From Swiss-Prot:
Lineage: Bacteria, Bacillati, Bacillota, Bacilli, Lactobacillales
Binding site for ATP: 155, 157-159
Species: Latilactobacillus sakei subsp. sakei (strain 23K) (Lactobacillus sakei subsp. sakei)
GO biological process assignments: DNA replication initiation; regulation of DNA replication
Region described as Domain II: 72-110
Annotated gene: dnaA
CDD domains: AAA (cd00009), Bac_DnaA_C (cd06571)
Residue span of region Domain IV, binds dsDNA: 328-448
Listed name of the protein: Chromosomal replication initiator protein DnaA
One GO cellular component term: plasma membrane
Family in the record: Belongs to the DnaA family.
Family annotation (PROSITE patterns): DNAA
Function text: Plays an essential role in the initiation and regulation of chromosomal replication. ATP-DnaA binds to the origin of replication (oriC) to initiate formation of the DNA replication initiation complex once per cell cycle. Binds the DnaA box (a 9 base pair repeat at the origin) and separates the double-stranded (ds)DNA. Forms a right-handed helical filament on oriC DNA; dsDNA binds to the exterior of the filament while single-stranded (ss)DNA is stabiized in the filament's interior.
Chain segments carrying region Domain III, AAA+ region: 111-327
Amino acid sequence: MPDLQELWNYLQEKFQTDLTTVGFNAWIKTAKPLAFRANELLIEVPSVLHKEYWENNLATKVVEGAYEFAEIELTPIFVLPGESDNLTPLEPEEEHVLTKAETPTFLRETHLNSKYTFDTFVTGKGNQMAHAAALVVSEEPGVLYNPLFLYGGVGLGKTHLMQAIGHQLLESKPETNVKYVTSEAFANDFINSIQTKNQEKFRQEYRNVDLLLVDDIQFFADKEGTQEEFFHTFNDLYNDKKQIVLTSDRLPNEIPKLQERLVSRFKWGLPVDITPPDLETRIAILRNKADAEHLEIPEDTLSYIAGQIDSNVRELEGALVRVQAYATMQNAEITTSLAADALKGLKLNGKSSQLSIAKIQSVVAKYYSLTVADLKGRKRVKEIVLPRQIAMYLAREMTDSSLPKIGQEFGGKDHTTVMHAHERISQSLTTDQNLKDAILDLKNTMKS
């Protein structure tokens, strides 16, 4: 076992970067590590409220942090003052299952989306190579392109192609063991397996497969323990000539804080990008969607809709749904004129060619009582770092500027700094209501 205080200091540093000062003082500074007990870490917290908060929000971070620090699999046990005196030592074979832990997803069957097949995938210039590579992999898994690494923006069909490989392989070889999972689910399964002492079961589930499909691999960033586990999973499968397919929104070497040995392995096979569909492909996608929904839409109307949306397939199909709903409410046939009314004022992705990075910087600086020079500068104090990251995030979300361009506008910062800021804010938005409110306020201010 590592030194208890050294481990706790490491965990505190992690929490300090993840939590606000108020949150850190309220939850972390009031807790103290007591001792190791078998494969458990006893942590004393001052109240039932603190205990519930730790179990529901912070326990998984303790598991992850312990694995990162010393490659040990610890289960955190939270006790109130005086409770530790009544705890008896655990025998090695005893199991303690946290009541909060859910059944890991690897104990439940993972289903492929029945709609994501090669038959329903519309090919075009932006995805031809990815489609061809996916077909090859589905016919000869583990031979030519291993791993197959599909990368590109949101809503371009990466998940569709990935799952199509699984469907095709199962159709030709029904006995094949196919596993589809998001990177987030893999990480959660790994952490839950430690908490429930099911590590061996976890490894059997993920390593005893013929085809492993892992979606959105970029979310492994900052998860050192999960990366370590996936490294060994990858090696086992690759050495057994089992096929691995990964998707990401960027190339392996552009994923921040991804271990170099994983970057290297992800490049062993074929990295292939998927770009936004051209006009002809967008029309074909809409026609395919309309046929599937049994919609009667004139060709010129499909062309009009395709001309309005050039970002991704998801936005494109969403626009068609919007037009269909509008026609239903109006009790009218779908025409180009009706489509124009339905899509009027629609700002896809919230991006605006009129909105400048300078405007975003000005609004954010005023909101946080800072100067634009603060946002462009290099001071690393928390009161400036967060607003700076928010401004970079909004510049990425609300303008068409490239990463290097945004970095240049923020005092000549590297594009990877912008990528990290966008990733950090995106992840925080899933849990931080105050941040959500601030982003909404800022967006409304800039749109008004």
